[in-house]
Amino acid sequence: MRRPVPYHRVAAIMTILSLAGAGHQARLDARGGMLTGPTANLAPGHVQANLAILPQAVAGDFLRFCQRNPKPCPLLAVSEPGDPSLPELGLDIDIRTDVPRYRVWRDGKLVDEPLDVRGLWRDDLVAFLIGCSFSFEEAMLENGLPVRHIEQGCNVPMYRTNIATHPAGPFSGPLVVSMRPLKAADAIRAIQVTSRFPSVHGAPVHLGDPALIGIADLGRPDYGDAVEIRAGEIPVFWACGVTPQSVVAAVRPEFCITHAPGHMLVTDLLNSRLAAF
């Protein structure tokens, strides 16, 4: 006679299935045009990913670029040429439809921001999925650290810097950073918390004076939305997965598709699985 499965194991299995379902539902909502906005704090517990899609002819160089720049470009997955599925990241993923908003680039110029890219898909396209700081924000919130853009219901502010990335083939350009204002004591705690997640950018690359990294005005981000910086707070900057978009603008490949900043692929992976310690 088979012994019944203990309740705690059933509960654990149901929790895992429920969590996976939240990521899948977010993708279905994007696929159906019901999710078109930023994904910060969406499907809590789930890994979110930045996207860059390039022709196979330059994919090898871009792979090396990511390997040489793991802070802004921590790779989570790479697709096979022409294959829009990414089974290692989740059930039934179609990278052509499951991101809330895309950007289309031709010769380095942004030409469109569609909700799906099925009509642009080619057999030679390779998708790169890159870790996103939205994943470590869950850990920040759990540790009582404020995340201002979530509080204000807007997109995270992102800025191009004067910090150069390490080139690979034709790919080179400035590092892009995301910014979250924190009190000094909270900034120290944020360093400790985010250091546990190197596959989603890890610890900050700079805190304090933005001019030292080439940012002239925090009120005018290059991507995303400006947020309030309150008395006693300092800006804290993390390497950002939008860096490939600044590189695309500089390198001007003949064709490229990216996510719109802040509009991520929500995966079935759990943030807890990415913690290094």
From Swiss-Prot:
GO terms of molecular function: lyase activity
Keyword field: Lyase
Matching InterPro entries: D-Glu_cyclase, Putative_hydro-lyase, UPF0317
Entry annotated with the keyword Lyase: yes
Gene3D superfamilies assigned to the protein according to its UniProt record, in alphabetical order: PSTPO5379-like, PSTPO5379-like domain
EC number of this enzyme: 4.2.1.-
Similarity field: Belongs to the D-glutamate cyclase family.
The protein, known as: Putative hydro-lyase BPP3031
